[in-house]
UniProtKB/Swiss-Prot annotation:
Its main location: membrane. One of its GO terms (biological process) is metal ion transport. Vacuolar transporter that exchanges protons with Mg(2+), Zn(2+) and Fe(2+) ions. May control the partitioning of Mg(2+) and Zn(2+) between plant organs. It comes from Oryza sativa subsp. japonica. This is Magnesium/proton exchanger 1.
Amino acid sequence: MANINMADTVPSCDTYLLFNGETLLPIGVRAFIYTAVLAYCFIGLSAITGRFFKSMESIMRHSREVVTVDPHTNATIVKHEKVWNYTIADVALLAFGTSFPQISLATIDAIRNLGQLTAGGLGPGTLVGSAAFDLFPIHAVCVVMPRAGSKKKISDLGVWLVELFWSFWAYIWLYIILEVWTPRVITLWEALLTVLQYGLLLLHAYAQDKRWPYVSIPLARGERPEDWVPAEDASVDYDDNYDGIGDILPGQNEDIVDIFSAHSYSNEGYHHVSEEDVEESSTGLTLKNKWEDTHWFSIWWQQFVDAATLESSVSRKMDSTCLRVIGISWNLIIAPWKMLFAFVPPYEIAHGWIAFICSLIFISGIAYGVTKITDQISCVTGVSPYVIAFTALAAGTSWPDLVASKIAAERQITADSAITNITCSNSVNIYVGIGVPWLVDTMYNYFVYQKPLYIDNAAGLSFSLLVFFATSFGCITVLVLRRVILGAELGGPRMWAWATSVYFMILWVVFVVLSSLKISGVI
């Protein structure tokens, strides 16, 4: 109670929302309002992340034309090659992209903390908590997603083992620099080494994918889709229009991408082109570009129309009035977010890069708002920001990961998209999500104060790392046993799938409870 009373005297608790008399409200009411606003921010974060994923998919599917001449026939041969390597796309763009809400939040927290010798607690707490949420609840959801009796396993076990090794090493490394080398202090070179290890992860994963001798694990690769976006499970009945603009041309999302991308992925391979076709193609290409521009603007305009529509064509066909009312109410709640994110250009333009960058800007803006609201919740309730970070913030920022992995586990023919992304994201959380903010703070302190960066709550963070390491070992052990005994990481007999899911959730509860008790000084 003493902490709650003290919260009223802290200047940062005076006001934040845009109405008068906020400070006159009871503490409980203010905490409820801030929590509701925080939840609304998470809804917006989930919405923009959906567009973010689609833009990444467009980027990673981009192919380029390589024109060669057949030495025997002198015919022009056009070859379409993927720009992105399958594994590098997973580690570089997908893992980084799915972790960007957490990375953005941690970086903003570090920038706000410039000028102080002590690091903020929101960033590291959120990233460690997010790693736990990714590993336990997301695995718990994915393992029960395949249909009863069906099994889905990782196709390239070697790459997964490499990524798993770097994921475990990331948390061992973090514990070493926090408790062994320079206890409770982060130096400039430690922060720099943390960031550089992300490059080593990329190199090692690529070496494993290419089966380089001496540095790769000699494991055979299973059947893997040719595209970065894996083939979809034909046994699953679903709506292709789950993305934000699915109602533009129902059931034709793939056709939209093929038409409006400068390089169609459906025509990969080789084909001969006569000289006459090459000469005559310039006029046709000009007309095609004009036609594409018109349709791009048409699609962009349709995004605003969809954002302003409270009842979709699907909900109109529902027989239940109650469900229709619920759907309209929900669309009314998220309408401001939908209208705001309609300004993000369609992901078909420039292979998705413009939508990718715009989505990053929106995610960063929401992350900044989340940090401010979290400060207010901590201030008015007296709850440690670190506790809020690895519980509410971690779950909220990882929610898009859960949705994406759930869809992948349900729709894809392999478990790579669902499981491998989790281990990659956890590595990125440390090497980039914690490394970059610490690098920013340590560089500032080194050049301005000639001082290192002090970690105020190093003991609590180190304890959380130990608990996470122990529980994650239990999680990975069960996944390996499922691979050996059942033949796949996901699916299988429903009883064992649900038993595994419950076990993973218990591990997450153990992590949250023990970490909270340590931060609160109970243990």
